Amino acid sequence: MALRIWASSTANALRLSSATRPHFSPLSRCFSSVLDGLKYANSHEWVKHEGSVATIGITDHAQDHLGEVVFVDLPEAGGSVTKATGFGAVESVKATSDVNSPISGEIVEVNSKLSETPGLINSSPYEDGWMIKVKPSNPSELDSLMGAKEYTKFCEEEDSAH
């Protein structure tokens, strides 16, 4: 447990140190996987809001920097999440990173496939690799998140700074 806490603090909020990041060209492959119609947090989670439910996962950019995902720690359905607060963790061959919720709400479903096949986050971050589904308690929180173009620019600037 102490090792997990240490690793989580080392790779806090999916921001890996430049020593563990591979060097990318200014437009790495991840930018082709920033999807329109989703909202993005600066901690590299995405939200797809449909009706009364929002699906949350980590972005392709995040999984690309993490490397091969080997374990996912998720909460149980029925609990709640708070905006900008951790709800789970992703362990990869490189590091362990906390996953923050971009919005607040009640967890209505958890992707149980990730316990058996955590690599779905790598192979399909926006489809099969989703993490939780939430009934938003404050849908206006979505307005503070980035669209695809803003998120792409954010990633470019973040990568060029490292």
Curated annotation (Swiss-Prot):
For this UniProt record, the keywords arranged alphabetically read as follows:
Lipoyl, Mitochondrion, Transit peptide
- Check the record and name the Pfam families matching this protein: GCV_H
Q: Where is the chain membrane-spanning?
A: none
In the UniProt record, the signal sequence range is none
Q: Where in the cell is it found?
A: Mitochondrion
- What is any one GO biological process for this UniProt entry? glycine decarboxylation via glycine cleavage system
Provide the transit peptide span: 1-31
Q: Which HAMAP family match?
A: GcvH (MF_00272)
Under the subunit heading, UniProt states: The glycine cleavage system is composed of four proteins: P, T, L and H.
Function description = The glycine cleavage system catalyzes the degradation of glycine. The H protein shuttles the methylamine group of glycine from the P protein to the T protein.
The protein in question is named Glycine cleavage system H protein, mitochondrial
Species this protein is from? Flaveria pringlei
